[in-house]
């Protein structure tokens, strides 16, 4: 137990220690006026004016148009895979519905995979489509967050920045250098990085085996730095080529948390009020630690059904103990629990264990984190989701004292509240709506491999993961069907754009408003009390919205397990 807690403290301590230096670096990237020679060349090639100012409408339009163009190009490349180079295994193109699901998944930073990477995509597709989207989707979300911050901090609604400049700088100055250095470390730790043919080997039993290789290290670095999550191999970070050592596992966890946590400090610097950034960071960290403790407790306690059968599940010198089904022995319960909590908090979606094999309440937490979708979150969208609850918290507090609510010196009026509620409600509408549809269609139910509450949990998890742009899965659901490829693809689009665009509009509207001086009735938003109020609002809204569905799924699954019922 003490060793497990030490791992948590060390990794979270390193993350917290890096918030300020990384935040200062990102702030410099976001506010710098000088362009590098490579950036100026890029602007000339794509024909943009880097000094152009964009309001929220133009910024949002640039996001949508650029994403649509990339979507169409990526779909074409996936469908023509069989005729393109760097395909040593001779893999055929994906079906139209699977190709749709794949390109939408990686364009929205979801990285949901209804396919096995090493058996479905060529080296060219992995690099030209998958890895490229990992950079552009991360930069897009990050850029949207910076524009959102400028709107909240600014006094000019016509200047939320320039989308093309933000994306270019983030890729050149942040993502590429960090990922290049990290990829070198991964190669040193044993990850493959090759364009050569698959390796052929003979097993101990004398059977022939073909071992998939490829440019793994380069994909793995941006996979976690960009909170993408899609794996080169079907086993994702549980595969020894994607995650060969405990050091790479720790680096994966840190990579996922590094930039999202630092964004809170960037926000504080943009506002000129560091306390506001620390309040957001503190609220996220409190929820993260609570969720981590819950996952670890239930997984370390083990499976009561096995305990009744006499299985030894206690921690000893020779075993990690607990519920080790679906987990890597080399990582144990502690690192696995931390990875699962991190990947669903940071909307990454990569896994070093099978979430479908967790206990009922162990699987409850990853699902709930994606439903809330604001505990650190991914590159930008998670931060925006947290701030939308800050706006709600201010609005609720204003109603309680009978005053017009104010946030950062700007009055929160009906338009802002309506757009915020659109962003808040789009999330459960997608998750619960598509889950309900799948539960009443016999064809959709045929994809289940488990009956009862656990089967329902698999469907609920799939649409939660898609809408939250996470990408992890309860893998017992056979999702490569026309229905799931189509509907999960739609849920990804709803989760991405019906959150991002309305909140970008809120930022633009607030930027155009005149600041009002703080009065006796102004609620300060940079205090621990307001941070606690925001966390309370997040948990209450999440509980009221999703608790009925969670009760039918993972909670009922856990209660059945306590009764000794395996599947029913």
UniProtKB/Swiss-Prot annotation:
Pfam families given in the database record: KdpA
Gene Ontology CC, one term: plasma membrane
Annotated InterPro entries: KdpA (IPR004623)
GO biological process per UniProt: potassium ion transmembrane transport
Listed GO MF terms: P-type potassium transmembrane transporter activity; potassium ion binding
Family to which the UniProt record says this protein belongs: Belongs to the KdpA family.
Protein name: Potassium-transporting ATPase potassium-binding subunit
Originating species: Deinococcus radiodurans (strain ATCC 13939 / DSM 20539 / JCM 16871 / CCUG 27074 / LMG 4051 / NBRC 15346 / NCIMB 9279 / VKM B-1422 / R1)
Gene name per UniProt: kdpA
């Amino acid at each position: 137990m003490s060793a497990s807690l030490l791992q948590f403290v060390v990794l979270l301590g390193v993350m917290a220690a890096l918030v300020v230096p990384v935040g200062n670096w990102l702030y410099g990237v976001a506010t710098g006026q000088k362009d590098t020679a490579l950036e100026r060349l890029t602007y000339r090639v794509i024909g943009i004016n880097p000094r152009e100012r964009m309001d929220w409408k133009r910024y949002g339009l640039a996001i949508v148009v650029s994403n649509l163009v990339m979507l169409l190009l990526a779909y074409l490349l996936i469908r023509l895979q069989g005729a393109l180079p760097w395909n040593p295994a001779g893999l055929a193109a994906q079906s139209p519905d699977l190709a749709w699901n794949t390109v939408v998944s990686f364009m929205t930073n979801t990285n949901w995979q209804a396919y096995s990477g090493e058996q479905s995509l060529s080296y060219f597709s992995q690099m030209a489509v998958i890895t490229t989207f990992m950079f552009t989707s991360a930069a897009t979300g990050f850029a949207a967050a910076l524009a959102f911050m400028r709107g909240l901090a600014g006094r000019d609604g016509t200047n939320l920045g320039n989308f093309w400049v933000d994306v270019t700088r983030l890729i050149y100055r942040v993502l590429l250098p960090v990922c290049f250095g990290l990829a070198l470390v991964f190669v040193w730790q044993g990850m493959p990085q090759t364009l050569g043919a698959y390796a052929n080997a003979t097993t101990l039993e004398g059977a022939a085996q073909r071992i998939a290789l490829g440019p793994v290290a380069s994909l793995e670095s941006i996979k976690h730095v960009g909170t993408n999550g899609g794996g080169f191999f079907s086993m994702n970070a549980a595969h020894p080529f994607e995650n060969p050592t405990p050091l790479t596992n720790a680096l994966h966890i840190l990579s996922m948390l590094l930039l999202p946590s630092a964004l809170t400090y960037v926000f504080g610097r943009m506002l000129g009020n560091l306390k506001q950034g620390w309040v957001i960071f503190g609220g996220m960290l409190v929820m993260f630690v609570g969720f981590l403790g819950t996952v670890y407790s239930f997984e370390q306690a083990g499976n009561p059904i096995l305990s009744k059968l006499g299985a030894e599940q206690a921690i000893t010198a020779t075993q990690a103990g607990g519920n080790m089904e679906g987990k890597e022995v080399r990582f144990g319960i502690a690192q696995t629990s931390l990875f699962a909590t991190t990947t669903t908090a940071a909307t990454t979606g990569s896994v070093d264990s099978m979430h479908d094999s967790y206990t009922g309440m162990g699987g409850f937490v990853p699902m709930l984190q994606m439903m809330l979708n604001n505990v650190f979150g991914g590159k930008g969208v998670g931060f925006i989701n947290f701030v939308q609850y800050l706006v709600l918290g201010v609005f609720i507090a204003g109603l309680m004292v009978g005053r017009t609510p104010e946030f950062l010196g700007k009055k929160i009026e009906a338009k802002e509240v309506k757009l915020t509620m659109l962003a808040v409600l789009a999330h459960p509408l997608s998750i619960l709506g598509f889950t309900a549809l799948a539960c009443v269609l016999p064809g959709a139910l045929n994809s289940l491999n488990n009956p009862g509450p656990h089967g329902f949990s698999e469907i609920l998890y799939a649409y939660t993961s898609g809408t939250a742009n996470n990408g992890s899965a309860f893998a017992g659901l056979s999702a490569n069907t026309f229905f799931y490829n189509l509907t999960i693809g739609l849920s990804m689009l709803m989760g991405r754009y019906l959150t991002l665009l309305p909140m970008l509009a809120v930022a633009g509207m607030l930027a155009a408003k005149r600041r009002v001086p703080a009065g006796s009735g102004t609620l300060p938003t940079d205090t621990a009390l307001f941070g606690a109020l925001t966390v309370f609002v997040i948990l209450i809204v999440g509980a009221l919205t999703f608790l009925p569905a969670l009760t039918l799924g993972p909670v009922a699954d856990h209660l059945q397990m306590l009764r000794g019922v395996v599947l029913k």
